[in-house]
């Protein structure tokens, strides 16, 4: 059965819901995220819940008025709510019936659905609210994180934007486009605390993700990035001064190519035995994007650096206009043994 059918059957009774939870244990173990909102990627590990945020609500309400007879009622977490079967999308079906609600009920509807699913899948699943709108309050719900997409260049009120970021419960992903702006964010901005960040920006200083990032994975695209900034990034990781949680960093430059050996020598890289195949660094992405790849691009490099504070190793690769940096959960001795 499709997930949509399983959910519909689960509303028949409490006993039916219990039976589904028991009979689908193996299937539910493969699910690692529940996404509220737009998620057009082919990802079998995700359950996608149709939930329009404020930027799409007017269109959503209009569609609801035009299709009155298609709606039916379900009891969700003790609340009677109107639903309809979701339209067949171009890429995939949604996995849950589409709720009907007014703008004023948005928070209570999300709360009811979230608690229903939390009881269904448990707290080991990652619950993500996906939105590209920053001027409304995100409800604080247990185990709910937020994924935000925006264009920093068109934001006029930076204080409101910072207030929105600080009011969000947990920032899972930030995806942003920055062009032709000198708007600065505070070094303490919650933007830099997102677990996953993907940026396209002209200048690496606006915002200064390369300097202030505190999350796990970053994919940064700059028009130009000076060699000294790449060197400073690696040295600050080596010293333990910054990037303590970092797992993976990809830095791509469109207008310049860093001199490979000069940068590697400047950061004090070490080299594995050139006669042996170096270990391959790759790990599961925090968030799957349009390329639909569940894992980071492999780093196969003889060059590596060691963090002074805990002897942790990171593979470093510079190829053409890219720097790739992958942190291993291994000490230097453990890392070198991988080649044996």
Where do the language-model regions lie?
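Non-core capping and flanking segments associated with repeat-based/extracellular domains
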Residues: 1-340
């Amino acid at each position: 059965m499709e997930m949509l059918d399983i959910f519909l059957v689960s509303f028949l009774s409490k006993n039916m819901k219990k039976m589904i939870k028991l009979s689908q244990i193996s299937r539910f173990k493969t699910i690692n995220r529940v996404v509220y909102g737009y998620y057009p990627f082919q990802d079998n590990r995700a359950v996608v819940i149709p939930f329009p945020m404020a930027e799409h609500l007017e269109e959503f309400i209009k569609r609801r008025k035009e299709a009155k007879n298609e709606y039916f009622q379900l009891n969700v977490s003790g609340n009677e709510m109107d639903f309809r079967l979701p339209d067949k999308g171009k890429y995939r079906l949604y996995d849950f019936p589409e709720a009907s609600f007014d703008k004023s009920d948005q928070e209570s509807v999300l709360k009811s659905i979230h608690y229903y699913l939390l009881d269904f899948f448990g707290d080991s699943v990652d619950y993500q609210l996906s939105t590209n709108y920053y001027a409304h309050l995100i409800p604080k719900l247990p185990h709910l994180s937020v994924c935000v997409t925006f264009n920093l260049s068109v934001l006029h009120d930076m204080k409101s934007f910072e207030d929105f970021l600080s009011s969000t419960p947990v920032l899972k992903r930030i995806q942003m486009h920055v062009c032709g702006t000198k708007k600065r964010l505070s070094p303490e901005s919650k933007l830099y605390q997102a677990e996953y960040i993907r940026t396209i920006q002209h200048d690496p200083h606006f915002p200064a993700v390369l300097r202030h990032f505190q999350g796990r994975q970053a994919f940064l695209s700059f028009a130009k990035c000076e060699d000294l900034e790449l060197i400073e990034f690696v040295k600050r990781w080596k010293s333990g001064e910054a990037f303590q949680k970092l797992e993976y960093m990809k830095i791509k430059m469109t207008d310049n190519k860093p001199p490979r050996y000069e940068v590697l020598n400047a950061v004090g890289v070490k080299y594995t035995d050139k006669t042996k195949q170096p270990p391959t660094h790759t790990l599961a992405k925090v968030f799957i994007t349009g390329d639909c790849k569940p894992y980071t691009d492999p780093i196969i490099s003889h060059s590596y650096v060691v963090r002074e504070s805990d002897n942790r190793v990171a593979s470093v690769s510079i190829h053409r206009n890219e720097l790739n940096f992958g942190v291993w959960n291994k000490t230097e001795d453990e890392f070198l043994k991988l080649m044996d």
